[in-house]
Protein backbone atom coordinates (compact mmCIF):
# COMPACT_ATOMS: atom_id res chain seq x y z
CA UNK A 1 0.00 0.00 0.00
CA UNK A 2 1.40 3.38 -1.04
CA UNK A 3 0.71 6.04 1.60
CA UNK A 4 2.58 8.88 -0.08
CA UNK A 5 0.34 11.32 -1.94
CA UNK A 6 1.41 11.82 -5.55
CA UNK A 7 1.61 15.60 -5.08
CA UNK A 8 4.14 15.29 -2.25
CA UNK A 9 7.62 16.54 -3.13
CA UNK A 10 10.40 14.46 -1.61
CA UNK A 11 14.01 15.43 -2.20
CA UNK A 12 16.13 12.59 -3.60
CA UNK A 13 18.46 12.75 -0.59
CA UNK A 14 15.59 12.36 1.90
CA UNK A 15 14.85 8.95 3.40
CA UNK A 16 11.10 8.38 3.74
CA UNK A 17 9.92 4.95 4.84
CA UNK A 18 7.38 3.56 2.40
CA UNK A 19 5.04 2.80 5.31
CA UNK A 20 4.82 6.47 6.33
CA UNK A 21 1.69 8.44 5.47
CA UNK A 22 2.50 11.63 3.56
CA UNK A 23 -0.31 14.03 2.68
CA UNK A 24 -1.09 16.27 -0.25
CA UNK A 25 1.53 18.86 -1.26
CA UNK A 26 3.86 17.92 1.59
CA UNK A 27 7.49 18.97 1.06
CA UNK A 28 10.27 16.80 2.47
CA UNK A 29 13.56 18.62 1.96
CA UNK A 30 17.15 17.44 1.63
CA UNK A 31 18.53 14.88 4.08
CA UNK A 32 15.31 14.47 6.06
CA UNK A 33 14.30 11.18 7.67
CA UNK A 34 10.65 10.11 8.08
CA UNK A 35 10.00 6.87 9.94
CA UNK A 36 7.49 4.11 9.21
CA UNK A 37 4.86 5.09 11.80
CA UNK A 38 4.78 8.78 10.93
CA UNK A 39 1.75 10.60 9.50
CA UNK A 40 2.31 14.03 7.96
CA UNK A 41 -0.67 16.23 7.08
CA UNK A 42 -1.29 18.22 3.93
CA UNK A 43 1.07 21.05 2.99
CA UNK A 44 3.44 20.50 5.88
CA UNK A 45 7.04 21.39 5.02
CA UNK A 46 10.17 19.75 6.38
CA UNK A 47 12.89 22.19 5.30
CA UNK A 48 16.02 20.00 5.49
CA UNK A 49 17.88 17.71 7.91
CA UNK A 50 14.66 17.08 9.88
CA UNK A 51 14.02 13.80 11.70
CA UNK A 52 10.43 12.67 12.27
CA UNK A 53 10.14 9.24 13.83
CA UNK A 54 8.20 7.19 16.36
CA UNK A 55 4.40 7.01 16.25
CA UNK A 56 4.10 10.67 15.38
CA UNK A 57 1.29 12.59 13.72
CA UNK A 58 1.97 16.05 12.28
CA UNK A 59 -1.11 17.94 11.16
CA UNK A 60 -1.48 20.27 8.18
CA UNK A 61 0.48 23.40 7.25
CA UNK A 62 3.30 22.96 9.74
CA UNK A 63 6.79 24.20 8.90
CA UNK A 64 9.75 22.40 10.46
CA UNK A 65 13.25 23.86 10.18
CA UNK A 66 16.67 22.16 9.92
CA UNK A 67 17.93 20.03 12.75
CA UNK A 68 14.57 19.48 14.44
CA UNK A 69 13.98 16.04 15.95
CA UNK A 70 10.28 15.23 16.17
CA UNK A 71 8.89 12.11 17.86
CA UNK A 72 12.15 10.80 19.24
CA UNK A 73 12.30 8.55 22.29
CA UNK A 74 11.72 10.33 25.61
CA UNK A 75 14.71 11.33 27.67
CA UNK A 76 13.50 9.16 30.52
CA UNK A 77 15.53 6.25 31.91
CA UNK A 78 12.31 4.34 32.63
CA UNK A 79 11.35 4.26 28.95
CA UNK A 80 11.59 0.69 27.63
CA UNK A 81 10.31 0.98 24.09
CA UNK A 82 6.60 1.14 24.88
CA UNK A 83 4.17 2.13 22.12
CA UNK A 84 3.64 5.79 22.94
CA UNK A 85 2.86 8.73 20.68
CA UNK A 86 3.32 12.37 19.75
CA UNK A 87 0.42 14.30 18.21
CA UNK A 88 1.03 17.77 16.74
CA UNK A 89 -1.76 19.95 15.34
CA UNK A 90 -1.79 22.41 12.45
CA UNK A 91 0.08 25.57 11.43
CA UNK A 92 2.90 25.22 13.93
CA UNK A 93 6.32 26.71 13.24
CA UNK A 94 9.11 24.55 14.66
CA UNK A 95 12.45 26.28 14.28
CA UNK A 96 16.01 24.98 14.15
CA UNK A 97 17.08 22.12 16.44
CA UNK A 98 13.84 21.84 18.38
CA UNK A 99 13.08 18.49 20.04
CA UNK A 100 9.60 17.09 20.69
CA UNK A 101 9.43 13.68 22.36
CA UNK A 102 6.81 10.94 22.43
CA UNK A 103 5.00 10.16 25.68
CA UNK A 104 5.56 7.53 28.36
CA UNK A 105 3.41 4.89 30.02
CA UNK A 106 4.01 6.59 33.36
CA UNK A 107 1.45 9.13 32.14
CA UNK A 108 -1.15 8.69 29.37
CA UNK A 109 1.41 7.72 26.74
CA UNK A 110 0.95 10.83 24.64
CA UNK A 111 2.71 14.14 24.13
CA UNK A 112 0.19 16.53 22.62
CA UNK A 113 0.85 19.85 20.87
CA UNK A 114 -2.02 21.97 19.57
CA UNK A 115 -2.07 24.39 16.65
CA UNK A 116 -0.63 27.81 15.75
CA UNK A 117 2.32 27.55 18.11
CA UNK A 118 5.80 29.00 17.59
CA UNK A 119 8.74 26.99 18.87
CA UNK A 120 11.88 29.09 18.45
CA UNK A 121 15.33 27.56 17.96
CA UNK A 122 16.47 24.85 20.38
CA UNK A 123 13.18 24.64 22.28
CA UNK A 124 12.51 21.29 23.98
CA UNK A 125 9.11 19.71 24.63
CA UNK A 126 9.63 16.62 26.77
CA UNK A 127 7.55 13.48 27.12
CA UNK A 128 3.92 13.75 28.17
CA UNK A 129 3.74 17.53 27.81
CA UNK A 130 0.42 19.11 26.87
CA UNK A 131 0.89 22.29 24.83
CA UNK A 132 -2.21 24.22 23.83
CA UNK A 133 -2.82 26.58 20.92
CA UNK A 134 -1.15 29.86 20.05
CA UNK A 135 1.73 29.53 22.49
CA UNK A 136 5.26 30.85 22.02
CA UNK A 137 8.38 29.12 23.30
CA UNK A 138 11.34 31.42 22.77
CA UNK A 139 14.89 30.24 22.10
CA UNK A 140 16.27 27.49 24.35
CA UNK A 141 13.11 27.07 26.42
CA UNK A 142 12.97 23.62 28.03
CA UNK A 143 9.69 22.06 29.12
CA UNK A 144 10.39 19.07 31.35
CA UNK A 145 8.19 15.98 31.35
CA UNK A 146 4.45 16.22 32.07
CA UNK A 147 4.33 20.04 31.78
CA UNK A 148 1.08 21.72 30.72
CA UNK A 149 1.26 24.95 28.72
CA UNK A 150 -2.19 26.43 28.20
CA UNK A 151 -3.43 28.43 25.21
CA UNK A 152 -1.57 31.64 24.30
CA UNK A 153 1.02 31.31 27.05
CA UNK A 154 4.45 32.79 26.27
CA UNK A 155 7.71 31.52 27.75
CA UNK A 156 10.81 33.70 27.40
CA UNK A 157 14.19 32.52 26.19
CA UNK A 158 16.48 30.30 28.27
CA UNK A 159 13.68 29.45 30.70
CA UNK A 160 13.26 26.02 32.24
CA UNK A 161 9.92 24.65 33.43
CA UNK A 162 10.07 21.90 36.05
CA UNK A 163 8.28 18.61 35.44
CA UNK A 164 4.54 18.50 36.23
CA UNK A 165 4.27 22.31 36.37
CA UNK A 166 1.46 24.15 34.61
CA UNK A 167 1.61 27.54 32.91
CA UNK A 168 -1.84 29.06 32.55
CA UNK A 169 -3.55 30.60 29.55
CA UNK A 170 -2.30 34.03 28.43
CA UNK A 171 0.46 33.95 31.06
CA UNK A 172 3.88 35.34 30.22
CA UNK A 173 7.08 33.97 31.74
CA UNK A 174 10.15 36.18 31.42
CA UNK A 175 13.46 35.03 30.03
CA UNK A 176 16.09 33.09 31.97
CA UNK A 177 13.50 32.07 34.55
CA UNK A 178 13.15 28.88 36.58
CA UNK A 179 9.53 27.76 36.90
CA UNK A 180 9.16 25.24 39.72
CA UNK A 181 5.52 25.88 40.63
CA UNK A 182 2.32 26.57 38.71
CA UNK A 183 1.92 29.92 36.96
CA UNK A 184 -1.73 31.06 37.09
CA UNK A 185 -3.49 32.20 33.92
CA UNK A 186 -3.17 35.84 32.82
CA UNK A 187 -0.14 36.49 35.07
CA UNK A 188 3.31 37.82 34.16
CA UNK A 189 6.25 36.41 36.08
CA UNK A 190 10.03 36.22 35.99
CA UNK A 191 13.11 35.27 37.96
CA UNK A 192 14.91 32.35 39.54
CA UNK A 193 12.87 31.28 41.36
CA UNK A 194 10.03 32.61 39.26
CA UNK A 195 7.79 35.12 41.08
CA UNK A 196 4.62 36.95 39.94
CA UNK A 197 4.76 40.57 38.80
CA UNK A 198 1.09 41.32 38.18
CA UNK A 199 -1.18 40.64 35.24
CA UNK A 200 0.00 40.29 31.65
CA UNK A 201 -1.87 43.48 30.79
CA UNK A 202 -0.30 44.12 27.40
CA UNK A 203 -0.91 40.55 26.31
CA UNK A 204 -4.51 40.61 27.52
CA UNK A 205 -5.26 43.83 25.65
CA UNK A 206 -3.72 42.44 22.49
CA UNK A 207 -5.90 39.36 22.88
CA UNK A 208 -9.06 41.47 23.05
CA UNK A 209 -9.94 41.29 26.74
CA UNK A 210 -12.50 44.00 27.57
CA UNK A 211 -12.42 46.51 30.42
CA UNK A 212 -14.69 44.49 32.71
CA UNK A 213 -12.57 41.40 32.26
CA UNK A 214 -9.41 43.36 33.01
CA UNK A 215 -10.91 44.93 36.15
CA UNK A 216 -12.20 41.58 37.36
CA UNK A 217 -8.84 39.91 36.84
CA UNK A 218 -7.07 42.71 38.70
CA UNK A 219 -9.35 42.07 41.65
CA UNK A 220 -8.83 38.31 41.40
CA UNK A 221 -5.06 38.75 41.27
CA UNK A 222 -5.23 41.03 44.30
CA UNK A 223 -7.23 38.48 46.25
CA UNK A 224 -4.70 35.77 45.50
CA UNK A 225 -1.50 37.72 45.93
CA UNK A 226 -2.00 41.04 47.74
CA UNK A 227 -4.63 40.66 50.44
CA UNK A 228 -2.88 38.14 52.69
CA UNK A 229 -5.71 35.65 52.26
CA UNK A 230 -5.49 31.89 52.33
CA UNK A 231 -6.00 30.18 48.98
CA UNK A 232 -9.44 29.04 50.15
CA UNK A 233 -10.40 32.59 51.11
CA UNK A 234 -9.05 33.97 47.83
CA UNK A 235 -11.07 31.44 45.84
CA UNK A 236 -14.23 32.42 47.71
CA UNK A 237 -13.60 36.07 46.88
CA UNK A 238 -12.90 35.23 43.22
CA UNK A 239 -16.18 33.30 43.06
CA UNK A 240 -18.05 36.31 44.46
CA UNK A 241 -16.57 38.56 41.77
CA UNK A 242 -18.65 36.74 39.14
CA UNK A 243 -21.75 38.50 40.46
CA UNK A 244 -20.10 41.91 40.26
CA UNK A 245 -18.55 41.23 36.83
CA UNK A 246 -20.93 38.88 34.95
CA UNK A 247 -19.17 39.53 31.64
CA UNK A 248 -15.96 38.24 33.20
CA UNK A 249 -17.43 35.05 34.65
CA UNK A 250 -15.65 32.79 32.17
CA UNK A 251 -12.15 34.15 32.79
CA UNK A 252 -12.74 34.27 36.54
CA UNK A 253 -13.87 30.65 36.47
CA UNK A 254 -10.76 29.61 34.60
CA UNK A 255 -8.52 31.55 36.97
CA UNK A 256 -10.19 30.05 40.03
CA UNK A 257 -10.34 26.50 38.69
CA UNK A 258 -6.64 26.61 37.78
CA UNK A 259 -5.69 27.79 41.26
CA UNK A 260 -7.91 25.20 42.95
CA UNK A 261 -6.46 22.35 40.87
CA UNK A 262 -2.82 23.12 41.67
CA UNK A 263 -0.89 20.24 43.21
CA UNK A 264 2.61 21.73 42.97
CA UNK A 265 1.57 25.01 44.53
CA UNK A 266 1.58 28.44 42.91
CA UNK A 267 4.46 30.80 42.25
CA UNK A 268 4.78 33.32 45.08
Residue ranges of predicted features:
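Terminal amphipathic alpha-helical/low-complexity segments used for targeting or macromolecular assembly
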Residues: 1-13, 18-19, 25, 61, ...
Amino acid sequence: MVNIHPTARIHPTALVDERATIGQDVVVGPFCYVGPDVKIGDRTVLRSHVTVEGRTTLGADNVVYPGAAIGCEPQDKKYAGEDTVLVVGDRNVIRENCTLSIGTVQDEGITRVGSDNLFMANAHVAHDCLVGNGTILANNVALAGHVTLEDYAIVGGQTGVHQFCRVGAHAMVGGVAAVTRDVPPYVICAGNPCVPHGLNLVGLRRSGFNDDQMRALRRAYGALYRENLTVKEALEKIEALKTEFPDAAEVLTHFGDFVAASTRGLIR
